[in-house]
């Protein structure tokens, strides 16, 4: 979007439901975001081509309007640290995704959806789940 005029300069249609309230992670080379039904996407910033998609598991809770099963929702904003994208999902997992390739490097199950964005401070991550738990992890 052209900031001065509001004119759309570029747009991309995806075969995904983007009814999420999270903020995308915008880097020099990519735009990374969650979807309401198909996991996490990374688009090449200059071309808007899909660079990768990381699949999440079916949601434990459906939050997208007019949604039905199966959904693989990601309502949180991604954060990046040392080439890894961290993002919580509606399936109850915290995902660690290689930012370059989209390969899921690790995932941790909480048993309740993760609807809040992960906070990163130094080598520590703070994660809250929908059951009211707060976790603090040291990243490797």
Task: Locate each region found by the language model.
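Short coil/turn segments within WD40 beta-propeller repeats
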Residues: 38, 91-93, 132
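C-terminal structured "cap/appendage" subdomains that terminate the fold
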Residues: 86, 95-97, 103
């Amino acid at each position: 979007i052209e900031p001065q005029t509001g004119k759309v300069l570029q747009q991309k249609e995806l075969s995904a439901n983007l009814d999420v309230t999270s903020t995308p992670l915008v880097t020099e080379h990519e735009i990374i975001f969650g979807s309401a039904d198909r996991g996490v996407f990374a688009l090449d910033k200059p071309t808007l081509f899909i660079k990768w998609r990381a699949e999440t598991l079916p949601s434990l809770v459906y939050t997208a309007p007019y949604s039905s099963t199966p959904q693989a929702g990601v309502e949180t904003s991604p954060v990046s640290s040392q080439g890894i994208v961290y993002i919580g999902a509606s399936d109850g997992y915290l995902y660690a995704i290689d930012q370059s390739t989209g390969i899921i490097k690790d995932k941790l199950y909480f048993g309740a959806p993760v609807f809040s964005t992960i906070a990163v401070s130094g080598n520590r991550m703070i994660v809250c789940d929908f059951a009211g738990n707060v976790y603090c992890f040291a990243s490797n």
